[in-house]
Swiss-Prot record:
Its cofactor is pyridoxal 5'-phosphate. It comes from Haloferax volcanii (strain ATCC 29605 / DSM 3757 / JCM 8879 / NBRC 14742 / NCIMB 2012 / VKM B-1768 / DS2). GO terms for molecular function: tryptophan synthase activity. This is Tryptophan synthase beta chain. HAMAP family: Trp_synth_beta. The keyword Cell wall biogenesis/degradation does not apply. It is an enzyme of class 4 (lyase). The beta subunit is responsible for the synthesis of L-tryptophan from indole and L-serine. Pathway: Amino-acid biosynthesis; L-tryptophan biosynthesis; L-tryptophan from chorismate: step 5/5.
């Protein structure tokens, strides 16, 4: 990364003049507290991750998946982190940083509700008032997490503009921040936005790969041949990859949401997927240059995924750069494959994954499963594979049951009695 926050052609700071003082203040705080550990900030952060968050999370062998796929499959269990997802790593770090900076109010956006929940928990823990912006469509898809945010003392502001999803929630949160920069910190939930957010969020999330790398050496006596993680904005992806980037012997796979199809209708302004690394083009979104889903006129298209947390039209600039350089391989899994993987992991390992995480397991099935359509790529995964379980699926139960019933997923149990809701 360059001094101005660029990763090759991507990144940078494309924000209104009114936000530049806040961006500069945050950049200074990031360099002093996170990079230089001023006042023991990182020591404080890691202690809280341990005591409040429950780190380290285990690296667990998936016995039945290993047998099914004829290779050693290990799961990095971020679903066991306090709150049920990797999101606390970043939320706790940023809320603590805001406290060190003397800020008095926290705002955040959320899609699936996991980042909002993690931010609400961190604010309750650190005694900071908090407001969460969430698209109306996502509120309807993720009602349990809305209740959890409110239960932790945060306000939840519905966003009704556009499609009412993550993209619109980020835009509304940015507007709030621009109006209240003096006393407010915006806790961005992914490795997106203007510098220093992509680097800062990656650094807070890198504890995932830091632990996984050490645990792999302890359990396997070596590094894994491949690390697989789902990719929306890219926070769990970069967290799972960060400490492996310099290990050329470890392949890195970012699994995007292929939605219903990779075909894009530019005339209608609709991308029935959220695969910006696969089908997107270079542009500017939410303060950074990156790869995104846009039409010929540069207008952001509507994205789609069965998973709220992957339903985003862009991706983090560093991840886009790593794909361009060939260090990370971008792949995709459609809605049906993700839902099937959701049921398979639940039935075979007793772990109900978030629909986001299910995309990573869907890719595994597509490459090394008994009837794998992409079996020619099986050797690339190698003998030892680590899959990041970015979160647990409690939040997705209602939508997963509805989607399963509509799609007639082969391996799913009979859901007829539940189609009216849980």
């Amino acid at each position: 990364m360059s001094a101005d926050g660029k990763f090759g052609d991507y990144g940078g700071q494309y924000v209104p003049e009114a936000l530049m003082p806040a961006i500069e203040e945050l950049t200074d705080a990031y360099e002093r507290y996170v990079l230089d550990n001023e006042d023991g900030f990182m020591d404080d952060f890691r202690a809280r991750l341990r005591d409040f968050g429950g780190r380290p999370t285990p690296l667990q062998r998936a016995d039945r998946l290993s047998e099914r796929y004829d290779r050693e499959v290990y799961l990095k269990r971020e679903d066991l982190l306090h709150g049920g997802a990797h999101k606390l790593n970043n939320a706790l770090g940023q809320v603590l940083l805001a406290k060190y900076m003397g800020k008095e109010r926290i705002i955040a956006e959320t899609g699936a509700g996991q980042h909002g929940t993690a931010t609400a928990m961190a604010c309750a823990h650190l005694d900071m008032p908090c407001e969460i912006y969430m698209g109306e469509r996502d509120i309807n898809r993720q009602r349990p997490n809305v209740f959890r945010m409110k239960l932790n003392g945060s306000e939840v502001n519905p966003v009704t503009v556009g499609r009412g999803t993550l993209k619109e929630a980020i835009s509304e949160t940015m507007r709030d921040w621009a109006t209240n920069v003096e006393d407010t910190h915006y806790v961005i939930g992914s490795v997106v936005g203007p510098h220093p957010f992509p680097s800062m969020v990656r650094d807070f999330q890198s504890v995932i790969s830091e632990e996984a790398r050490t645990q792999a050496r302890e359990k396997l006596g070596r590094l894994p041949d491949a690390v697989v993680a789902c990719a929306g904005g890219g926070s769990n992806t970069m967290g799972a990859f960060a400490e492996f980037v310099d290990d050329e012997e470890t392949a890195l796979y970012a699994v995007e949401a292929g939605g219903s199809t990779l075909e894009v209708d530019e005339e209608a302004g609709v991308a029935p997927n959220s695969a910006s690394l696969t089908t997107g083009s270079e542009g500017i979104l939410h303060g950074a240059r990156t790869r995104l889903l846009q039409d010929r006129d540069g207008q952001i298209m509507e994205s789609h995924s069965v998973s709220s947390g992957l339903d985003y039209a862009g991706v983090g600039p560093e991840l886009a750069h790593l794909v361009d350089t060939g260090r990370v391989t971008a792949v995709n899994v459609d809605d049906d494959a993700a839902l099937t993987a959701f049921h398979r992991l639940s039935q075979m390992e007793g772990i109900i994954p978030a629909l986001e995480s299910a995309h990573a397991f869907g890719y595994l099935e597509s490459v090394v499963g008994p009837d794998a359509p992409d079996a020619e790529n099986a050797d690339d995964l190698g003998e030892y594979v680590v899959v990041n379980v970015s979160g647990r699926g409690d939040k997705d139960l209602e939508s997963a049951i509805e989607e399963t019933y509509e799609r007639d997923i082969d391996i799913a149990p009979n859901m007829d009695e539940f189609t009216g809701g849980l």
